[in-house]
């Protein structure tokens, strides 16, 4: 995907979504090294195999590019899984215009845990797939849709796994009822201008669902902070402290 829109993004960490905080809550210059930080996760364990299975399940629908049957079926599956894990699910539908004027049937999926809680955390990812493999080394594939296991079935899979383990924590009465969590699956993210198009790339042609959501928030909605999960399933992936997050939420990062 092409990141063009910040939606309350704080930080992304590997696996269990661990957060780091300086003792004095001040920004420090950190030298990037190859060393992996050792942390002690708090709370239920994140199951990587389960997240992998959720990723595969999405890919089994085939490409999830806009207006396709695979896209529609996968959307229904995502809704059913969040409901299975006790989330209150709402959808936000709209007809959006692609870079070339194509009408896109967009569906943002919002799943909430403890919807009555006023202190809320936002986690988000996009669930549509890129309709063109315009970065493929083989130009013969440039106009073919991609399966998109990493970009971005992996992000939705992480959210589903978190919903699953939080549901287990709630069943065991170990979850803070004063805290609400919102999972938002953005649609129409990756219909941005392809490299082979005869028009200039327009940043606003990307992240259409996120743009629509940010302009049509539920009345009174406010999240304390948010985490964007994008392309988190790559082999040997490394995630660094992101600049915008360090600027706006250093105490969380």
PLM feature spans:
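Solvent-exposed loop/turn segments at secondary-structure junctions
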Residues: 65-66, 95-98, 115-117, 127-131, ...
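Acidic/histidine-rich, surface-exposed loop or edge segments in extracytoplasmic proteins
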Residues: 34-39, 52-64, 142, 236-237
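A non-catalytic alpha/beta surface segment that caps or lines the substrate-entry region
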Residues: 53-116
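Hydrophobic membrane-insertion alpha-helices, especially the h-region
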Residues: 4-16
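Sec/Tat-exported extracytoplasmic proteins
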Residues: 59-66, 82-86, 113, 131, ...
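Acidic/histidine-rich catalytic neighborhood of metal-dependent amide-processing enzymes
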Residues: 143-251
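Sec-dependent signal peptide cleavage junction
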Residues: 20-49
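Solvent-exposed, acidic/flexible segments
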Residues: 44-51, 64-75, 102-104, 148-156, ...
């Amino acid at each position: 995907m092409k990141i063009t829109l910040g939606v309350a993004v704080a930080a992304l960490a590997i696996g269990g979504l661990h957060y780091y905080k300086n003792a004095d809550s001040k920004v420090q210059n950190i030298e990037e090294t190859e060393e992996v930080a050792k942390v002690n996760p708090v709370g239920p364990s994140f199951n990587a195999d389960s997240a992998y299975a959720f990723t595969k399940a999405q890919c089994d629908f085939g490409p999830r590019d806009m207006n396709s049957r695979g896209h529609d079926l996968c959307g229904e599956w995502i809704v059913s899984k969040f409901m299975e894990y006790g989330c209150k699910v709402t959808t936000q539908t709209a007809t959006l215009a692609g870079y070339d004027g194509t009408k896109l049937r967009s569906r943002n999926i919002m799943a909430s845990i403890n919807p009555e809680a006023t202190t809320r955390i936002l986690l988000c990812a996009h669930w549509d797939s890129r309709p063109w493999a315009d970065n493929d080394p083989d130009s013969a594939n440039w106009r073919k849709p991609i399966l998109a296991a990493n970009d971005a079935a992996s992000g939705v899979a992480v959210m589903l796994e978190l919903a699953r383990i939080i549901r287990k924590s709630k069943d065991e009465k170990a979850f803070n009822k004063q805290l609400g969590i919102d999972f938002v699956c953005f649609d129409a993210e990756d219909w941005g201008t392809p490299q082979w198009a005869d028009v200039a790339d327009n940043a606003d042609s990307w992240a259409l669902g996120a743009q629509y959501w940010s302009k049509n928030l539920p009345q009174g909605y406010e999240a304390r902070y948010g985490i964007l999960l994008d392309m988190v399933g790559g082999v040997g992936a490394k995630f660094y402290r992101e600049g915008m997050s360090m600027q706006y939420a250093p105490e969380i990062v």
